[in-house]
Every structure is written in structure tokens, then in C-alpha cells.
């Protein structure tokens, strides 16, 4: 049984990774507000063990508003308003999954604990400045995460929404994993094919057909 340390532990010793950590540390030390809080940056890996991953949902960078980001892509803390992209994911779920009720919060830990890796491709952001940490080196790290999942695991489902996620997912072996693509669920693009994509039910059909327990998407 491999764990995250086995497959990506050495990345943390790489100069690029140390540089990313150092830049984030310096920004915080200089009084900048960086999201998520330091202890939550790697939450995606804490909530979903390597051997437990069944589904990978790729986000871009963390939410940059106060108290939103907590280290899981698309997820927000329970007391925070549900962001528009996640609201659209919930709307699709109400159409796609029989009996799904519109949740009152956007806290997706329940998904993560069932094996849904909610991975942002950039792990930090400065308050109010989307993509402000896009060039720190996080992309290289998350490319490695995708590569080790592709290589060491079988029959995963990758949900790639929007061109950024789809580009990141080009290395995935589609003969060994299910890759589902759609426009991003943001209000700008959801109507171009995210609504009606049925990715949540397709994910569960694939898991069940391969002898795995489906995801209970209800939050």
C-alpha cells in the first residue's frame, strides 16, 4: 500500500517546491493575506489518502475571498456562501442524481472522505488577486500528482472541466482511466455544456461497473 509520501514525498525536496514554499512564507511574513491558511494548503492530501482516490476533480487556484478556501478545490467552509461555480455543480447534480437535494453549504469534505480528490492545480493565492500565485511552481507539483495517480493507480475517474483542467489532463492514459470533459461550471461557461454533462452519474456507473462503491454526492 503506497501513501502520498511514497509517491510524491521526494518532490518536497526539489528546489522548485522549496522556492514555492519560501515565496508563500515571505508573502505572509510581509503582511500579505494568503489563502488558504498555512495549515490547510495541503488539505486535499489529508482528506483523501493515495490508495483511497477514486475520482479526481481538478480546480484552478483557490478562492481568493475571505474565509472561503480551505485546501479543497471548489469547496468552502460551512458558514460561507456557496460560490457560483459550486452552485452550478449542485444544479447539475439535482438534474443528474435522483433524489439529490440542493445543499445549504459548500463544504465538500464528505466527497473527499469518500475518495474524491479535490485538487487545485495552484495551491495558494493572494487575497483578492486570482491567479496571483500561478507562476510559483505549484503547477509542476500538481502535474506530478496527476502523473503518479495515472501511473500507480487503475480505473480512476478524472473530471476535467474547462480548458485549463483539460490541458493538465493530457497525460492521463485513457485506456486505464475514465476521463470526462466538459466546460467549466462557472456562470460564464456552464451553459455551453456543463449543464447536462451527467458527469456525476457517469462517474458512479463506471465505479460500480468496476466493482467499486459509488460516491454519495449529497452534501
UniProtKB/Swiss-Prot annotation:
Where does the UniProt annotation locate this protein? Cytoplasm
User: Which BP terms in the Gene Ontology apply to this protein?
Assistant: base-excision repair, AP site formation via deaminated base removal
Q: What is its EC number?
A: 3.2.2.27
Work out whether the entry's keyword set contains Nucleus: no
Q: Which Pfam families match?
A: UDG
Catalyses which reaction(s): Hydrolyzes single-stranded DNA or mismatched double-stranded DNA and polynucleotides, releasing free uracil
The molecular function terms of the Gene Ontology recorded here are: uracil DNA N-glycosylase activity
Principal localization reads cytoplasm
Q: Where is the active site?
A: 61 (proton acceptor)
Recorded hits in SMART domains, A to Z, give: UDG, UreE_C
Q: Which GO terms describe its cellular component?
A: cytoplasm
* Top-level taxonomic group: Bacteria
Q: Which UniProt keywords apply?
A: Cytoplasm, DNA damage, DNA repair, Hydrolase
Q: Do you know which InterPro entries this protein is assigned to?
A: UDG_fam1, Ura-DNA_Glyclase_AS, Uracil-DNA_glycosylase-like, Uracil-DNA_glycosylase-like_sf
PANTHER family in alphabetical order: URACIL-DNA GLYCOSYLASE (PTHR11264:SF0)
Entry function: Excises uracil residues from the DNA which can arise as a result of misincorporation of dUMP residues by DNA polymerase or due to deamination of cytosine.
| Similarity section | Belongs to the uracil-DNA glycosylase (UDG) superfamily. UNG family.
What is the designated name of this protein?
Uracil-DNA glycosylase
Q: What species was this sequence derived from?
A: Haemophilus influenzae (strain 86-028NP)
Amino acid at each position: 500500500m503506497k501513501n502520498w509520501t511514497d509517491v510524491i514525498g521526494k518532490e518536497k525536496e526539489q528546489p522548485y517546491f522549496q522556492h514555492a514554499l519560501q515565496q508563500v512564507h515571505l508573502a505572509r511574513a510581509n503582511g500579505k493575506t494568503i489563502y488558504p491558511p498555512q495549515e490547510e494548503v495541503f488539505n486535499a492530501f489529508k482528506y483523501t489518502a493515495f490508495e483511497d482516490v477514486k475520482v479526481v476533480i481538478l480546480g484552478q487556484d483557490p478562492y481568493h475571498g475571505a474565509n472561503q478556501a480551505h485546501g479543497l478545490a471548489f469547496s468552502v467552509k460551512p458558514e460561507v456562501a456557496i460560490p457560483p461555480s459550486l452552485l452550478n455543480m449542485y444544479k447539475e447534480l439535482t438534474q443528474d442524481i435522483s433524489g439529490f437535494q440542493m445543499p445549504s453549504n459548500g463544504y465538500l469534505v464528505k466527497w473527499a472522505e469518500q475518495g474524491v480528490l479535490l485538487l487545485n492545480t495552484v495551491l495558494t493565492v493572494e487575497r483578492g488577486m486570482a491567479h496571483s500565485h500561478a507562476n510559483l511552481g505549484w503547477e509542476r507539483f500538481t502535474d506530478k500528482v496527476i502523473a503518479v495517480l495515472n501511473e500507480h493507480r487503475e480505473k480512476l475517474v478524472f473530471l476535467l472541466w474547462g480548458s485549463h483542467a483539460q490541458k493538465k489532463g493530457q497525460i492521463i492514459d485513457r485506456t486505464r482511466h475514465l476521463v470526462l470533459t466538459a466546460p467549466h461550471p462557472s456562470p460564464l461557461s456552464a451553459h455551453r455544456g456543463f449543464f447536462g454533462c451527467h458527469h456525476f452519474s457517469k462517474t458512479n456507473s463506471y465505479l460500480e461497473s468496476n466493482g467499486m462503491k459509488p460516491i454519495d454526492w449529497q452534501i
